[in-house]
Regions:
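Pocket-lining segment of extracytoplasmic ligand-binding domains
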Residues: 84, 162, 167-259
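Short helix-capping segments at alpha-helix termini
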Residues: 47-51, 151-157, 195-198, 264, ...
Length: 324
């Protein structure tokens, strides 16, 4: 799906200046099954009208790390991945900036690890040696499992993780192919559908492990933001505005998501389980969203101490992020 708006004038609601020779800019991205990113919602709401910005869906992301590979390779302008995956990619040499939180975890939106009702698994300690279905390796759910085990004094690699696409998480759990299915905070549509069928029990969630924090980020290449500073600012401000819209108008957001999913040929029914994006009001990150994972990666020896600096990674539209 390509969403195009003519370059007439900047959206007045954003309060942004318009240069006399406003060039049209195409922003390519990979979509995720079962939901919309905030920039997709922003486009549906008309927040890019008159900005000269075109956002173009060029396919589906097979997990956050694959999205970052596409971003690094130049086949998209926007990536999206769990914070730890973003930091690993930056540490490996990719000059990315974290534009805005794609989702977050709080009491309303969280990743939950489910078992069947009759499962003997009842705590983090019980997941040792068990098989857990996650959407991808090296991303949010992977690191949540590692951190949960670490906090209990257990080896971080003592559970077996297997990759299962979101639409199949319920199926593999009910069929006994895995012991646990982890439904990510961005997969609340699939979670709701699974719970509707009954017979599942939550063991733990990522807020138990991490507290309230951004779960992942929409990511831009730094060179692109320098070449297109106005467009980068518009993109972020329109997207964070859409995050607030979803918070304030959840039912309308569900209607939009359902319509777009139907247009994509996906199951529109799951949109009714959309629980929000789980981010703070205003959609802006705080440094802890990044620093928490920097500390984890340094502790694990994945990155050298001091290699990553949270403030340098966070993209700024002029509003400095808070520090806590």
């Amino acid at each position: 799906m390509t969403i195009h708006f003519p370059a007439l004038a900047l959206a007045a609601a954003l309060g942004l200046p318009l240069s006399p020779a406003w060039a049209e800019v195409n922003i390519r991205y990979l979509a995720s099954q079962g939901g919309l990113s905030a920039h997709e919602l922003a486009a549906e709401l008309g927040y890019f009208d008159g900005t000269g910005i075109t956002i173009e869906n060029v396919g589906y992301a097979q997990g956050g790390p694959a999205s970052l590979v596409a971003l690094a390779g130049g086949s998209v302008e926007v990536g999206s991945a769990a914070t730890a995956a973003v930091l690993n990619s930056i540490a490996a040499g990719n000059d990315f900036v974290a534009a805005y939180p794609s989702n977050g975890i709080n009491d309303e939106a969280q990743s939950i690890f489910y078992v069947l009702d009759d499962s003997p698994i009842r705590s983090v300690e019980d997941i040792v040696g068990k098989t857990i279905a996650v959407n991808t390796l090296g991303a949010h759910l992977d690191y949540v499992v590692r951190e949960a085990l670490h906090q209990k004094g257990l080896p971080q690699d003592s559970a077996n993780l297997v990759v299962v696409p979101g639409p199949q998480l319920e199926q593999v759990l009910r069929s006994g192919q895995v012991d646990i299915s982890a439904f990510g905070y961005w997969q609340t549509t699939f979670t709701g559908a699974a719970l509707q069928n009954g017979g599942l029990r939550a063991v733990f969630d990522d807020t138990d492990v991490l507290g309230e924090i951004a779960g992942g980020f929409i990511v831009l290449r730094r060179d692109w933001t320098l070449a297109h500073p106005d467009e980068a600012r518009i993109f972020v401000e329109a997207s964070t505005r859409a995050l607030d819209y979803a918070r304030d108008n959840p039912e309308k957001a569900r209607e939009i998501i359902a319509r777009v999913l139907a247009e994509r040929g996906e199951n529109a029914e799951v949109a009714r389980y959309f629980a929000g994006y789980g981010v703070r009001k205003g959609g802006l990150p705080v440094e802890r969203d990044i620093q928490f994972w920097i500390d984890v990666l340094e502790r694990q020896g994945a990155v050298p101490p001091g290699r990553l600096v949270a403030r340098d990674i966070l993209f700024s539209t002029g509003d400095s992020p808070k520090t806590n």
